[in-house]
């Protein structure tokens, strides 16, 4: 693990055994942040954001953000880390990075993700923690569209937030790791191209409209964007125990010696994509005794399209490159080939670490900057994945990837 004077250490979050230690954890007093909504009030109602068959109404909180400014004085606009929370695409909140000390029924313990946020601020980064629509509010690619809209929002309002629109990175854990990889590696197949709401049909979100560039509207969601002329391309990304291939998650678990079904999962994949895999041929022939499931009211064709396109591994494999256009909004970063750091616990029984290994190997084959940290004995969501050393390594990797030290 490397360290640098430009990336201050976060000391004391864990003890020698890697267990959270509240007594020695740094206390960040008076954390300042601002909250808001990256989809403006009423916009999602007026434009009837597609839910792709989901069952629950959308509230304004689905588009909430917390923005934490850089705390280190810097002479130029700060780079921005957009943090995407986890929670099986159905739970979680953007507020998870607010408090560095968690108060639970069992007592106080360090919030290692918030400590990561504080370390980034101290290193000159701004951090934005965002919400997105849960799978019961919008099936995929709804959540992906939301994260990309958040990137566009901060890019469009960079001056107001004091950030550099060319130096935006995205990161997240678990479901947030999956979405972060999707944002990073689906790129911006028509960067800067404005798409009016009338120019893209509702079906084009699934790649069926000749008026939209190939893959573009399915991955981008510009038809319902308030900032369609702004790029969603990011300069770098990080995934903590994220899913890279939803098709293989259920075979990876038994192969790794874990149970096929995981209590934290509870059908998260089919609830996100619209059906179990393989996709049933007909809603009327669903056989629940065989484990087949379909979200009520979903279009089978949409579920099929989701199962074809919702996997970061397909976007990074050379033979399945999604995007071949280099974005002018992120110099040196080609669509589908964004620098990516991966962190995964070796004892992860929910998302086996092989899910990250495959992405790492694919990026190495393509000679794309990447790093993989495997954490011994760490389970899914383990605080040891955010140890001070790993936070240091993440800072160094992202600093290099966005060329933060260029000319400094």
What does each model-identified segment do?
Residues 2-4, 12, 22-408:
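Alpha/beta-hydrolase superfamily serine-hydrolase fold, recognizing
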